Amino acid sequence: MEVKNIGIPHVLPPASVCDDPLCPWHGHLKVRLKLLEVTVEKVRMHKAAVVIHEWLHYIRKYNRYERRRKRMRVRVPECIEVKPGDKVIIAETRPLSKTIAWVVIGKKEDVVEWKAKHETLQA
């Protein structure tokens, strides 16, 4: 099966192939350009997982940052294997169910840094 170009240049496609229609690489699911780096918390649902997105929010009154976190449910295609504790890249998509509107597009290890790729092209 042919791997689609999802329009995100830094993320490598998975090595395995699936026939999942809701896979951005091998199916017909389109992704939007909102990307997040998150940590997988639970993988108990069928083809879905719960992830945690953590970020720092600046409080101007106290000149300090506070840590914020959000739990999100994401779709996990069959070609991407994830387990709790993995760092993954997720992309926004159309609503797939009542609570799922994001899909895993790859693990953090599968991301190619743009500068490193650009330097190798010029060398």
Swiss-Prot record:
Part of the 30S ribosomal subunit. It comes from the Archaea. GO terms for cellular component: cytosolic small ribosomal subunit. GO terms for molecular function: rRNA binding; structural constituent of ribosome. Belongs to the universal ribosomal protein uS17 family. SUPFAM superfamilies: Nucleic acid-binding proteins. The gene is rps17. It holds the Pfam family Ribosomal_S17. The keyword rRNA-binding applies. This is Small ribosomal subunit protein uS17. PANTHER family: 40S RIBOSOMAL PROTEIN S11 FAMILY MEMBER, 40S RIBOSOMAL PROTEIN S11-RELATED. InterPro entries: NA-bd_OB-fold, Ribosomal_uS17, Ribosomal_uS17_arc/euk, Ribosomal_uS17_archaeal, Ribosomal_uS17_CS. Gene3D superfamilies: 2.40.50.1000. It comes from Pyrobaculum aerophilum (strain ATCC 51768 / DSM 7523 / JCM 9630 / CIP 104966 / NBRC 100827 / IM2).
